[in-house]
Structures are given as structure tokens and as C-alpha cells.
């Protein structure tokens, strides 16, 4: 009867009803006796109610007996208030915890004495701690729900205590809050939750790490109140309310030592002092700590603003591999200090020991520090969320994410169970075999051995992933023989070593090494950089020895060192990443142009570290997103242009490096070059429009468009392509003057605007120029206005344009314009290209143009792949000729891209299949080789003087067995193309 009455009102949401298989009993008889012995001492109705719940739910009964056996702390909470236990067991834990917090807030809001608040918060803590522990032990909540509940409890406790203290201060007239019920709002007092509390990951018996800041001009302070003494006193009161131990316990231990320079600063710091400290003295561990920082109490708006100001300290603009060694040093020091240098079971510290929680956190945080500046999506607080994003962005493998996530959840569960024993902030397992046997049962295992097997498996997997990141001897120095690399050319041991590595000129290499090791170059004058470089040299020499021409590779790296103005980051990057060093060695050996770019701007190397580097080439949407991140916080027009230039140079460098490494087809690279240019053009168009309008206003109904011609229009760009552009505009005739302070008439307005636009591209800053711009393809060329109104452009194309201008128009593509204006321009272009034409006249004009080009540029150089007889110009002219002649009857032939136009012509039966089978492979061959030559050669290409690295890359790009075979194929191809050109269009050889 009692049993049914007690359990009848329970539904399946009640905590008691939701217990699953949990702990096991080490000594079932003794545990049952201990539990029953306590029940005997209770009032009969309480004992009957608790016993009935245990009988109804056997898993709950075992869990309660396990607590009596293994956890003095939880058993004390149970024995201290049996009614509290019944409340917790009968209610749904989610609703019960919410009600506990709500009731506590109501009580504290009405309290007038600090003692009342302290008592209320301790009652809250006791019941919430019991509820959360039971949800953990019974498997009712997953681990991260447990940590979030603990975090919410801590956060709300801090908020209640702080609000009470500020309410008291308001009553004393020391602050004048606009909202007396929420005196913290607008107070300028900021409480940051750090570490696990900041990330929603608080453990069961954790301290709470807080940093308290205040604004010097705190708006709610009374005029005669000094900020520092006031906020220090409030902070001390907050700490006292939460952590003072009394007969009814404590709420949370408070640790304020994560603030700047805690040994010499007060417990509350001004935001001005904090920002100055982080800018001048902030260390890597403080950057790592700030990843998880979160405003948890006080003025939350001011807290968010402060974190935004601190963000540049935490998130460096460029990849920061120096953080690797800093973080690893921190971890090593902790392990050494705590004697946790090996994996174990008995006594092992699951937090800071080998393979522990801290290694998982550091694994994630270090990579967040390295890349979070460039990739804002990595700026997340929770560890598991960071692992998820790192895997999604290919910074880590899916296997690493899964194994580290599983280990983290397991170790956090172990950590909680250890702390539940005595409510101690310990992370160490019991240190005897018998104690581990007992603990294993409390955790749900049937033996010490089964627990140890799982524990060691998780620890070893974590250590393996951590070691790959931190301890893999990234420089490779540990495996190399102990040679004095600075000994110079007289040291026979060094010379023998260099010969054994494959260097053919050891005397020269030894001399160069001596210069490096003595710090003779500008970049090596900084002691820390010089020391890092000396440690890196052995691995560098070994890696450069793998090049096709090792001696040339050393010379190329030497040129890079001499050209560097600052190189600490570059040396750090290369020393931590052997694959990157291999790639840079290839760049230096084959493409001096890219090497020079790297010397001027070492930060462009960052993109090579991005896991996406070897993936699919980014499309326009992804490029736009990256560009937006690059420009997000530019503070001025000049900084905006500098960042655009850096983005453009880095993109060129990355695409070029992929071409050299053979990891992207050259046609894709051509499109990628064009996509980068198009994104930059659109961005500059918008920026200049806004800047220009701020001075000159706007013309009513104005619209501007940028028309891409040439290689940008056809999306066939190379690393050295300039931009062929035409600016087209329109406006309402009834109001032709702009409405700005300095008004301009229509045509003058757009001419001046176009000049400003060109200047944005071509002005040289510290980061060089964006692009060279060529506007000679506009109507009337240099003789015409720099910008064309749409009706004038249409009239010119219809009535005055030469055949060569219509040939060029086949590549015209609107790349930046409002949609409606874009459509109008495209209609004009299509109308021009699809009008009827006389094939004989067009053929004659094209042949004449080709002869003129040959006379001006020459056509006898086989390696002038553009202008040689049978070169790319011949193929372009064939594709353009076919479009002009046939577009009237077959408009589907039209395409801005040469290969696509040839495909269309073949599909429509306008180009013979046999001719297409010559022209298409020829175009691809020329484009493949041209991409390489534009990257690697500034002047004309001469095979006799070209380096072996370049020739090797060209042979690979041309899919030939060797260079002589490649050259023979080029000559044969040119002969075949010229024959088709003469047959289709006519020429001197026809």
C-alpha cells in the first residue's frame, strides 16, 4: 500500500524513474547494511518513502547504496536532508533545477542581509549538487549536459551575489543605477568567466576562474566615489559570499589569479590597464585562456565590448606557429611539476597527466590560436565544438576528432566521479590497486582491469594525437648526425656530411652555412630568430638536399634570407612543418618570381598551411567570404587597399604554388586567377563608389558597370595577366549633375570616377599594386573617353568598331554591375555579336591582323607560345572568327572562353572534328605551359639557360617524358595549328 501510494504519482520524467545501469557495488552486503542503517534512523514516513522508491527502481537502489559505500560527500548531502532527497528523486531534474534557480533568485532579490544571501546560495548549491550528481551517476544526463548544468549553477550564483552587493551599494548612494532591480546593467563592472566556466564545461568540484574588470568612467558611480577602491571592495565581497566556508558549506571556490600580473595587481582591474597589459606583456598562455573567456555577470554589454578589444591580442592576423612551442612548454612544465610524465592507472592525473584532458584542450586551443585570426569560425569556446570545426575545415582528421571526443567525454566522466567522492578539486585517481578496484565499481565497471583497459586505451590515443602536433620532432633534427654547420669550408667532417646528402659543391654550401650560422643577414640579427634558425638549419639542409639540384636550392634559400626584412614567423613556420619546407624549396628552385614575393611578404605563406590548400580550388562564393574576412576590420581606405593587395598577392602565390606542385589543373588555375581578380574588382568597384560619392555625391539614376575583356573576360588568366577593363555607365538625362558638395556634370563625373577606380588598382603601396589595368579596348581606344555611356558604347559597336574590336568583344563579360544594368549591357553585346557578317571580309580582316601581329612581335620563337606561328593567338583567332561568322545563324556558338567556343563550334558542326582534335589539345598544351612560364620567367624563355627545376616542372605540365620530347611536341603542334589557321582563315601560306 505504501509502495503504490508513493510511486503512483511518479511519471517517467521523474529522476527516480529514469535511472539506468550505473555503479556496481564493491561490497554489496556492507553497502546494503550502511544504507539500511541510515534508513532505520529516519522518521518512518521518510524511510518508507525512500525505501519504496528503491524497491520500485532497482538501478536507483544500487546507485544510492553505491553512494553510501563510495562517496562520503554525497552521502552526507543525502543524510543531511532526507526530504531534499525525495524532492530531487520525485521531480523531473530539468524542471527541478530551473525551479531551484528561480526560487533562489527570488529570495536573494528580497534579502537585506549578506548572511541571508550566503545561506540561500548554500542551500541552492547543496540541492543542485545532489541533483546533478544523481543525473550523472544514473546516466540520465550525458556528460556535457552535466557540465552545462554546473556552469549554469555557477553563473547564476555569481550573478545573484553580485546583484545583491550592487543593490546594497545603491542603497548607500555609491552607485546610481538606471534600473534599481538590475543595478549591474550599465555599471561598467565586468565579470569574465574563464576556463571551463567560460566554455560551459565546469567540472563537479571545480573552482570558478573569474577576472573582474571595471571601466574607469563607470557611468553609474556616484561623483565622489573612486572606481578602484569601490570595485575592489565589491569583488572581495563577491568572493566572500561564494567561497567562505561555514557550517552549511560553501557555494564555489573562487580563483581570481588569471587576471594580468596577479601578484602585483588588485583583484579588480580597469579595462584600460588590462588592454595595456595584454598589448605590451600578454603571453601565449593568456591568449589561450582568453579563448574561453565569457562575460558571465555584471555589465554584459561592456564585457562583450572588452572582449572585442582584446580579440586582436588573442587572434593574430597571421598564422602563429610560434604558439606551438609555447603551449607545449606550458604542458611539459605542468607534467613535470605534478610528476605526470608517464601514462599510468593508479594515481594518474586525468587532467594534466599524459593523455589527459589538458592535452585534448591544448590540442584544440593551439590550433585555434594558430589559425583563428584568419579563420573566425575557429573562435569558439567549447573544446568539443572546436574539435568539430577543426575537422570540418580539415585542420584535423575525422579520426582525430572522433577519438579525442570519445576520450574527452570518458575522462570528464572519470574526473566527475573522482570529485564526487569527497567534493575535492582533485583530478588524480586513487593511488592503490584496492582503491582503484573500489573506484572502478563506483564508475560502473566490474573490475579494476576492465576500467584500466579502457582508461589506458583513451590515454594512449590522446597522447598519440597530441604527440603528432607537439612532439614529433618537426625539424627532424633529433635524427641527424651532430655536425657543426657553422664550421666553414675547412671542416672536413662537414664537407663529408654535405657530400653524403648529395650536394655537389660542398665548399660553396659550407661557406653559405657559415654565413647563416653567424647571423650575418639582416633577418637574423634578432637573437630569438637567430637561435630558432640555428636549430632549424640541420633539417633545412637535409630537406633542400632532396631537390633535383640541391646546390641551387640552397642558393635560392640564401637569396630569400638576404631579401627578408623580417623573418621570425617564416622561420617558425618552416621549422614546424616539413611538408611546407618541401613546397617552399620547390618554389625557390623553380619560380624566383614567387620567391621574391615571399621575401617581400612572408605572411603570404600562411595560406599554404590552410588545410584547404590542397583541396578543391575555392569558388567565387568562398573567395568572397575569405575576402570579407580579410577586410572586415580595416580602419581606413588605405588599410582597405593594403589588405586587398595582400589578399591578391597571397591568392596569386597560392595558386602559383599549386601549379608548380602539380596539384591543380592549369585550366582550373586560370579560372581561379580570374575569380580572385573578379572578386577584387567587385570589391574595389563598391569601395570606390562609396568613397567617390562621399565627396561628389551621386547622379540621379546613375549606374556603373565594369566590363572584363581579354584574359579576365575569358577566365584564362595567368599569374602575370593585367586587367583589360571597360567602364560603362548611365544616368537620367533630366538631372545630369551630381548632388554632392562638389558637383560634377555627368560625363565628367564618370570620367573622374573611372580615374579614381584605376588609381585604386595601380597605386603602389607598401604591398605593391593590385593589378596593372589596360583600358585600351574601350571605344576609340586611347583617343576615346575613359568611360563610355551605354548608348554611346552600343552606337560605337554598331557603327564604328573595327573587326578586331568585335573579335575582342567575344570575350566581354560583365563582372560588376547591378543586375538590371548588367542585363542591358549583355543584350547590347549579344546584338553586336549575332548580327550578319560577310565571312570573306571577316577572314581577310583576321588574316591581316595576324600578319600585323607577326610583323610587330615576330613569330619564329617556338617558346613564344602566344605569338609563334601556330601559337595561342592563332587558336584564339580561329575561335573568335567562327563566332563572328556563325553567331547570327547559330548564337549558341558564343562563349567567352576559347576552349568552350571551340567545343560549341564542333557540337554545332561548324568546326570539323579532325580540326577540333588538333586545336583543343593544342590550346590545353599552350595554356599549361604558359601558366608555368608566366610564373617562373620574367623575360623570354630560353631552354639553354633555364634551371633544372623549371624544366622538370614544364615536362610534367606538358605530360612529356623529357624536355626534348616536349619541345618536339610543341613544334609539331604549332605546325598543325598554323595549317588549320591557313585553311580556315587564309594567310601567306594558304
UniProtKB/Swiss-Prot annotation:
A biological-process GO annotation: regulation of glutamine family amino acid metabolic process
Catalytic activity annotation: [glutamine synthetase]-O(4)-(5'-adenylyl)-L-tyrosine + phosphate = [glutamine synthetase]-L-tyrosine + ADP; [glutamine synthetase]-L-tyrosine + ATP = [glutamine synthetase]-O(4)-(5'-adenylyl)-L-tyrosine + diphosphate
Keyword Ligase included in the entry's annotation: no
Keywords: ATP-binding, Magnesium, Multifunctional enzyme, Nucleotide-binding, Nucleotidyltransferase, Transferase
Function: Involved in the regulation of glutamine synthetase GlnA, a key enzyme in the process to assimilate ammonia. When cellular nitrogen levels are high, the C-terminal adenylyl transferase (AT) inactivates GlnA by covalent transfer of an adenylyl group from ATP to specific tyrosine residue of GlnA, thus reducing its activity. Conversely, when nitrogen levels are low, the N-terminal adenylyl removase (AR) activates GlnA by removing the adenylyl group by phosphorolysis, increasing its activity.
Family designation: Belongs to the GlnE family.
Protein name: Bifunctional glutamine synthetase adenylyltransferase/adenylyl-removing enzyme
Amino acid at each position: 500500500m505504501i509502495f503504490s501510494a508513493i510511486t503512483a504519482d511518479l511519471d517517467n520524467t521523474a529522476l527516480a524513474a529514469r535511472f539506468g545501469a550505473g555503479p556496481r557495488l564493491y561490497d554489496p552486503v556492507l553497502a546494503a547494511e550502511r544504507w539500511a542503517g541510515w534508513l532505520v534512523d529516519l522518521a518512518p514516513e521518510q524511510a518508507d518513502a525512500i525505501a519504496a522508491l528503491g524497491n520500485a527502481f532497482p538501478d536507483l537502489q544500487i546507485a544510492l547504496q553505491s553512494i553510501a559505500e563510495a562517496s562520503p560527500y554525497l552521502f552526507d548531502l543525502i543524510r543531511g536532508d532526507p526530504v531534499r532527497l525525495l524532492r530531487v528523486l520525485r521531480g523531473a531534474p530539468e524542471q527541478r533545477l530551473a525551479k531551484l534557480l528561480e526560487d533562489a533568485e527570488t529570495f536573494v532579490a528580497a534579502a537585506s542581509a549578506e548572511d541571508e544571501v550566503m545561506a540561500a546560495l548554500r542551500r541552492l548549491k547543496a540541492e543542485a549538487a545532489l541533483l546533478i550528481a544523481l543525473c550523472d551517476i544514473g546516466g540520465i544526463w550525458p556528460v556535457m549536459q552535466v557540465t552545462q548544468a554546473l556552469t549554469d549553477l555557477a553563473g547564476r550564483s555569481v550573478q545573484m551575489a553580485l546583484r545583491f552587493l550592487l543593490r546594497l551599494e545603491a542603497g548607500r548612494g555609491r552607485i546610481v543605477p538606471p534600473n534599481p532591480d538590475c543595478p549591474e546593467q550599465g555599471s561598467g563592472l565586468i565579470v569574465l568567466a574563464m576556463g571551463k566556466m567560460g566554455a560551459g564545461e565546469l567540472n563537479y568540484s571545480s573552482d570558478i576562474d573569474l577576472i573582474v574588470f571595471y571601466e574607469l568612467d563607470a557611468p553609474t558611480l556616484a561623483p565622489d566615489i573612486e572606481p578602484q577602491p569601490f570595485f575592489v571592495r565589491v569583488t572581495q565581497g563577491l568572493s566572500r559570499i561564494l567561497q567562505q566556508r561555514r557550517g552549511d558549506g560553501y557555494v564555489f571556490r573562487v580563483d581570481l589569479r588569471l587576471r594580468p600580473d596577479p601578484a602585483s595587481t588588485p583583484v579588480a582591474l580597469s579595462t584600460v590597464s588590462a588592454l595595456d597589459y595584454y598589448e605590451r606583456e600578454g603571453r601565449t598562455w593568456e591568449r589561450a585562456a582568453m579563448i574561453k573567456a565569457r562575460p558571465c555577470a555584471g555589465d554584459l554589454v561592456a564585457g562583450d565590448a572588452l572582449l572585442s578589444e582584446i580579440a586582436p591580442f588573442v587572434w593574430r592576423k597571421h598564422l602563429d606557429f610560434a604558439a606551438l612551442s609555447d603551449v607545449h612548454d606550458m604542458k611539459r612544465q605542468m607534467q613535470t611539476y605534478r610528476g605526470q610524465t608517464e601514462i599510468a592507472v593508479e594515481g594518474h592525473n586525468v587532467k594534466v597527466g599524459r593523455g589527459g584532458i589538458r592535452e585534448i584542450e591544448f590540442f584544440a586551443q593551439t590550433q585555434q590560436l594558430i589559425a583563428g585570426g584568419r579563420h573566425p569560425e575557429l573562435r569558439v569556446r567549447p573544446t568539443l565544438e572546436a574539435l568539430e570545426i577543426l575537422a570540418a575545415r580539415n585542420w584535423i582528421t575525422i579520426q582525430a576528432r572522433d577519438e579525442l571526443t570519445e576520450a574527452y567525454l570518458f575522462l570528464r566522466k572519470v574526473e566527475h566521479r573522482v570529485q564526487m567522492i569527497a567534493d575535492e578539486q582533485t583530478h588524480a585517481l586513487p593511488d592503490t590497486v584496492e582503491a582503484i578496484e573500489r573506484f572502478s565499481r563506483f564508475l560502473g565497471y566490474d573490475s579494476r582491469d576492465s576500467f584500466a583497459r579502457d582508461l589506458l586505451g583513451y590515454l594512449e590515443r590522446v597522447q598519440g594525437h597530441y604527440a603528432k602536433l607537439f612532439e614529433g620532432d618537426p625539424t627532424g633534427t633529433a635524427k641527424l648526425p651532430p655536425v657543426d654547420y657553422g664550421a666553414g669550408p675547412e671542416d672536413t667532417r662537414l664537407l663529408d656530411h654535405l657530400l653524403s646528402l648529395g650536394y655537389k659543391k660542398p665548399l660553396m654550401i659550407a661557406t653559405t652555412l657559415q654565413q647563416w650560422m653567424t647571423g650575418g643577414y639582416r633577418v637574423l640579427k634578432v637573437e630569438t630568430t637567430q637561435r630558432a634558425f640555428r636549430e632549424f638549419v640541420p633539417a633545412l639542409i637535409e630537406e633542400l638536399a632532396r631537390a633535383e639540384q640541391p646546390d641551387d636550392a640552397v642558393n635560392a634559400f640564401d637569396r630569400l634570407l638576404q631579401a627578408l626584412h623580417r623573418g621570425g614567423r617564416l622561420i617558425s613556420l618552416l621549422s614546424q612543418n616539413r611538408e611546407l619546407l618541401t613546397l617552399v624549396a620547390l618554389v625557390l628552385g623553380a619560380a624566383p618570381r614567387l620567391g621574391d614575393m615571399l621575401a617581400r611578404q612572408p605572411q603570404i605563406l600562411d595560406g599554404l598551411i590552410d588545410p584547404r590548400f590542397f583541396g578543391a580550388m575555392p569558388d567565387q562564393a568562398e573567395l568572397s567570404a575569405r575576402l570579407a574576412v580579410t577586410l572586415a576590420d580595416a580602419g581606413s581606405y588605405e588599410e582597405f587597399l593594403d589588405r586587398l593587395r595582400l589578399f591578391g598577392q597571397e591568392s596569386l602565390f597560392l595558386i602559383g604554388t599549386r601549379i608548380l606542385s602539380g596539384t591543380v589543373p592549369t585550366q582550373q588555375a586560370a579560372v581561379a586567377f580570374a575569380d580572385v581578380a573578379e572578386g577584387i574588382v567587385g570589391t574595389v568597384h563598391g569601395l570606390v563608389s562609396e568613397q567617390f560619392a562621399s565627396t561628389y555625391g551621386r547622379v540621379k539614376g546613375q549606374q556603373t558597370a565594369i566590363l572584363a575583356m581579354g584574359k579576365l573576360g575569358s577566365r584564362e588568366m595567368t599569374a602575370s595577366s593585367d586587367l583589360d577593363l571597360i567602364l560603362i555607365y548611365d544616368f537620367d538625362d533630366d538631372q545630369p549633375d551630381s548632388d554632392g558638395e562638389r558637383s560634377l556634370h555627368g560625363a565628367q563625373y564618370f570620367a573622374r570616377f573611372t580615374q579614381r577606380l584605376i588609381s585604386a588598382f595601380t597605386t603602389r603601396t607598401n604591398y605593391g599594386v593590385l593589378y596593372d589595368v589596360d583600358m585600351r579596348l574601350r571605344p576609340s581606344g586611347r583617343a576615346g573617353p575613359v568611360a563610355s555611356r551605354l548608348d554611346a558604347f552600343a552606337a560605337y559597336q554598331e557603327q564604328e568598331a573595327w573587326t578586331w574590336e568585335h573579335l575582342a568583344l567575344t570575350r566581354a563579360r560583365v563582372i560588376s554591375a547591378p543586375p538590371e544594368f548588367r542585363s542591358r549591357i549583355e543584350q547590347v553585346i549579344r546584338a553586336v555579336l549575332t548580327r550578319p557578317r560577310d565571312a570573306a571580309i571577316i577572314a581577310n580582316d583576321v588574316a591581316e591582323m595576324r600578319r600585323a601581329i607577326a610583323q610587330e612581335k615576330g613569330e619564329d620563337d617556338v617558346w613564344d607560345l602566344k605569338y609563334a606561328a601556330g601559337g595561342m593567338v592563332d587558336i584564339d583567332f580561329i575561335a573568335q572568327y567562327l563566332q563572328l561568322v556563325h553567331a547570327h545563324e547559330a548564337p549558341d556558338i558564343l562563349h567567352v572562353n576559347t576552349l568552350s567556343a571551340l567545343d560549341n563550334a564542333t557540337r554545332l558542326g561548324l568546326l570539323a572534328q579532325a580540326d577540333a582534335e588538333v586545336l583543343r589539345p593544342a590550346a590545353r598544351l599552350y595554356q599549361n605551359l604558359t601558366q608555368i612560364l608566366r610564373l617562373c620567367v620574367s623575360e623570354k624563355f630560353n631552354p639553354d639557360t633555364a634551371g633544372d627545376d623549371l624544366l622538370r616542372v614544364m615536362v610534367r605540365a606538358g605530360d612529356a617524358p623529357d624536355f626534348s620530347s616536349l619541345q618536339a611536341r610543341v613544334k609539331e603542334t604549332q605546325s598543325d595549328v598554323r595549317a588549320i589557321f591557313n585553311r580556315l582563315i587564309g594567310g601567306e601560306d594558304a
